[in-house]
C-alpha cells in the first residue's frame, strides 16, 4: 500500500472528524489536561501552544485551568468545532501547517500529543520540531507524546482491528514498511450504511532516533517515559535551550 505523504491535508474532514470528536470521553480529557499541566510546569496565565490541536479538546481544558492557549491545526472542520466550543475561554485558533509557527520566543510551553507526530517525511518532522523550538522562550518545556516508537509499536501492532464509536464503525488495517520505517494505515469508516476508505501514514522512530531529532531541533531532553514491554504511548519532556 502506497500512501501520499500529503494525506493529512484532506483526511480530517467529514466522517473522520465525526469519529475523532466522539473517540474520547470527557473524563479522559480532564486527566490528560492535568498530566500536561504537571509536565509543562508553568503557572496560570502562561502562554501555551497546542500543535496540532484538532478540535481543541486539550486547549479548551487547559484554558479553563487558567492558561492562555494558541491552537494550531490545518483542518478547517476541526477548527470550526474548536471555535464553536470556545465560549469565554482564552484560546486563539490558527489555521496553519504545523511547520509554520511565526511567533519567535512567544510561548512558555508547547505540546504535541495523541498520534499527531510523524505525519510528515523526515525533513518535515525535523522542521516541525525546529518550528516549535523557535516559538518557545528559552527554558520553556515541550511535551511530545507519540505511539510511533518502534520498540513499542511493533509489539502491539495488529494487522486489522475494529473500533466502534457510537453508531460509527472503523476498520483499521496496518502495514509496516521496514524500509521506510513508516506505518501505512487504511481506515474504513462505516456509518449509516455508507462505507468510506481513507489512508494515512506515520513515520516511526526508535527511542534513540527521536531523542536525537528533538535535541537537533534545539532542545535538551529532561525526561522520557522508561521503556516497558506493555507501553503503548511514549512521552518526551524537553526544554528549549
Task: Please give the residue ranges for each predicted region.
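Conserved class I S-adenosyl-L-methionine
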Residues: 1-43, 45-52
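Class I SAM-dependent methyltransferase SAM/SAH-binding core
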Residues: 57-100
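A short acidic, Gly/Pro-enriched loop at the edge of an enzyme's catalytic core
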Residues: 102-109
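Residues lining the SAM
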Residues: 113-115
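SAM-dependent methyltransferase
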Residues: 123, 143-213
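A short glycine-rich, Lys/Arg-flanked "PGG" loop and its adjoining helix->strand segment in the class I
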Residues: 126-138
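C-terminal lobe and adjacent flexible extensions of AdoMet/dcAdoMet transferase-like proteins
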Residues: 209-241
Amino acid at each position: 500500500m502506497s500512501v501520499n505523504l500529503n494525506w493529512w491535508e484532506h483526511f480530517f474532514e467529514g466522517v473522520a472528524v465525526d469519529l475523532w470528536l466522539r473517540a474520547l470521553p470527557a473524563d479522559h480529557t480532564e486527566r490528560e489536561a492535568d498530566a500536561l499541566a504537571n509536565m509543562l510546569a508553568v503557572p496560570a496565565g502562561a502562554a501555551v501552544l497546542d500543535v496540532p490541536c484538532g478540535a481543541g479538546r486539550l486547549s479548551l481544558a487547559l484554558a479553563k485551568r487558567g492558561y492562555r492557549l494558541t491552537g494550531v491545526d490545518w483542518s478547517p472542520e476541526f477548527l470550526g468545532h474548536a471555535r464553536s466550543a470556545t465560549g469565554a475561554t482564552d484560546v486563539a485558533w490558527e489555521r496553519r501547517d504545523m511547520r509554520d509557527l511565526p511567533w519567535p520566543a512567544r510561548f512558555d510551553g508547547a505540546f504535541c500529543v495523541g498520534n499527531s507526530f510523524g505525519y510528515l517525511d523526515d525533513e518535515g518532522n525535523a522542521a516541525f520540531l525546529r518550528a516549535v523550538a523557535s516559538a518557545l522562550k528559552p527554558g520553556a518545556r515541550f511535551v511530545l507524546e507519540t505511539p510511533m516508537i518502534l520498540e513499542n509499536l511493533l509489539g502491539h501492532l495488529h494487522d486489522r482491528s475494529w473500533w466502534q464509536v457510537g453508531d460509527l464503525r472503523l476498520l483499521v488495517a496496518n502495514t509496516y514498511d521496514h524500509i521506510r520505517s513508516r506505518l501505512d494505515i487504511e481506515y474504513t469508516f462505516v456509518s449509516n450504511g455508507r462505507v468510506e476508505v481513507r489512508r494515512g501514514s506515520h513515520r516511526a522512530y526508535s527511542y534513540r532516533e527521536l531523542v536525537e531529532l528533538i535535541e537537533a531541533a534545539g532542545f535538551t531532553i529532561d525526561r522520557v517515559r522508561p521503556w516497558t514491554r506493555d507501553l503503548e504511548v511514549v512521552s518526551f519532556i524537553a526544554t528549549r535551550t
